[in-house]
């Protein structure tokens, strides 16, 4: 089945890796089929939403039977390009950046941090989690040597985020995962995801104080 991925709602697309991770766990445990209710309980997404998400991809299950785990796993592996490796660069090897290098998305088959950059001389030239750390001043040199690194993770001070982003744009970056408080200006063809941990924490505290669980959607 040929599916126009651009017509899949972004909210649905963001949930696909969550479904895929749970299906991998089911497959590893030997489970052969799963219902939308079981999926719902595991991933904390209501079953109606799961059925709607899956409906964008055609008939993935059978009424009264549920979903075949092997079939779903194979389908979502292909949909999420799990067999195609995407190299990622990390910029900013502070506490958060160092944690990313040690983790390096080992549970993902299709993403890998292949190089990191920093300005700290004590880190330049070292390896952290098997990832080489280079001088940020030589960003262009190292990226051009390697070639295709379409994604960058930013874990730098906010004041440095936009100037570094401008350099990444010039290098042809396609996507940025931004962990800085800065709201970055990028061309329309570049996708950027902002993850501000301080804002997320403040939002959580606000909801705890002012909303009960039953009030939320």
Swiss-Prot record:
Cellular localization per UniProt: Cytoplasm
GO CC terms, sorted: cytoplasm
InterPro entries for the chain: CoA-bd (IPR003781), NAD(P)-bd_dom_sf (IPR036291), Rex_DNA-bd_C_dom (IPR009718), Tscrpt_rep_Rex (IPR022876), WH-like_DNA-bd_sf (IPR036388), WH_DNA-bd_sf (IPR036390)
Chain sites annotated for binding NAD(+): 92-97
Primary localization: cytoplasm
The keyword ATP-binding belongs to this UniProt entry's keyword annotation: no
DNA-binding region: 18-57
Protein's GO biological process: negative regulation of DNA-templated transcription; response to redox state
GO MF entry, a single one: DNA-binding transcription factor activity
One Pfam family linked to the record: Put_DNA-bind_N
Keywords for this protein: Cytoplasm, DNA-binding, NAD, Repressor, Transcription, Transcription regulation
NCBIfam families, per the entry: PRK05472.1-3, PRK05472.1-5, PRK05472.2-3, PRK05472.2-4, PRK05472.2-5
Functional note: Modulates transcription in response to changes in cellular NADH/NAD(+) redox state.
Family statement drawn from the similarity comment of this UniProt entry: Belongs to the transcriptional regulatory Rex family.
Subunit: Homodimer.
Record's protein name: Redox-sensing transcriptional repressor Rex
Source organism: Bacillus pumilus (strain SAFR-032)
Gene: rex
């Amino acid at each position: 089945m040929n599916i126009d991925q651009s017509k899949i709602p972004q909210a649905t697309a963001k949930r696909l890796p969550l479904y895929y991770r749970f299906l991998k766990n089911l497959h590893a445990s030997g489970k052969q089929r799963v219902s939308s209710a079981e999926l719902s309980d595991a991933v904390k997404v209501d079953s109606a939403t799961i059925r709607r998400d899956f409906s964008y991809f055609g008939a993935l299950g059978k009424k009264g039977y549920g979903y075949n785990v092997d079939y779903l796993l194979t389908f979502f592996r292909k949909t999420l390009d799990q067999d195609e490796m995407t190299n990622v660069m990390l910029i900013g090897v502070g506490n958060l950046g160092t944690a990313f290098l040690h983790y390096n998305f080992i549970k993902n088959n299709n993403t890998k941090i292949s190089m990191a950059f920093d300005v700290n001389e004590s880190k330049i030239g070292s390896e952290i989690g098997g990832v080489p750390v280079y001088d940020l001043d030589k960003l262009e040199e190292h990226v051009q040597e390697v070639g295709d690194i379409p994604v960058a993770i930013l874990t730098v001070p906010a004041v440095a985020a936009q100037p570094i982003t401008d350099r990444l744009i010039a290098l042809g970056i396609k996507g940025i995962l931004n962990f800085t408080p800065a709201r970055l200006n990028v061309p329309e063809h570049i996708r950027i995801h902002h993850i501000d941990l301080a804002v997320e924490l403040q939002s959580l505290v606000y909801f705890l104080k002012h909303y009960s669980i039953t009030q939320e959607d």
